[in-house]
């Protein structure tokens, strides 16, 4: 591999003001350091760095259905029919995707068909 002579290296170092050959592998200053400081996490379910099991730091376990604070509709008590409804409860038939199939009638003039 070609390199400059010692005289040329010293001349370059003197002109630049620092040693250009000292750390060639770390020539970029924006590279992150190998030892990182510990993270500064906000206080929450995962603020502990150790003894923090996945099931306790999973945010989905903390979610609950919304609580109804106020409603304009009156809720029915389970097991009791509504007192104000005058219409008797009728059972609803199952919904079919098409009109009911008509039953075919056999012709009376040709009984073998």
From Swiss-Prot:
A molecular-function term among this protein's GO annotations? NADH dehydrogenase (ubiquinone) activity
Q: Which InterPro entries match?
A: NDUA7
Role this protein plays = Accessory subunit of the mitochondrial membrane respiratory chain NADH dehydrogenase (Complex I), that is believed not to be involved in catalysis. Complex I functions in the transfer of electrons from NADH to the respiratory chain. The immediate electron acceptor for the enzyme is believed to be ubiquinone.
Which Pfam families does this one have? CI-B14_5a
| PANTHER family registered for this protein in UniProt | NADH DEHYDROGENASE [UBIQUINONE] 1 ALPHA SUBCOMPLEX SUBUNIT 7, NADH-UBIQUINONE OXIDOREDUCTASE SUBUNIT B
Q: Keyword Electron transport: yes or no?
A: yes
Species classification: Eukaryota, Metazoa, Chordata, Craniata, Vertebrata
What are the record keywords, sorted?
Acetylation, Electron transport, Membrane, Mitochondrion, Mitochondrion inner membrane, Phosphoprotein, Respiratory chain, Transport
This entry carries the following GO cellular component terms, namely: mitochondrial inner membrane; mitochondrion; respiratory chain complex I
Kindly list the places in or outside the cell where this protein is found, as annotated in its UniProt entry: Mitochondrion inner membrane
Q: Tell me where in this chain the PTM N6-acetyllysine is found.
A: 40
- Renumbered to this chain, region (Disordered) spans 32-51
Which residue windows are transmembrane per the record?
Answer: none
Into which family does the record put it? Belongs to the complex I NDUFA7 subunit family.
Query: Which membrane topology describes this protein?
Result: Peripheral membrane protein
User: What is the protein name for this chain?
Assistant: NADH dehydrogenase [ubiquinone] 1 alpha subcomplex subunit 7
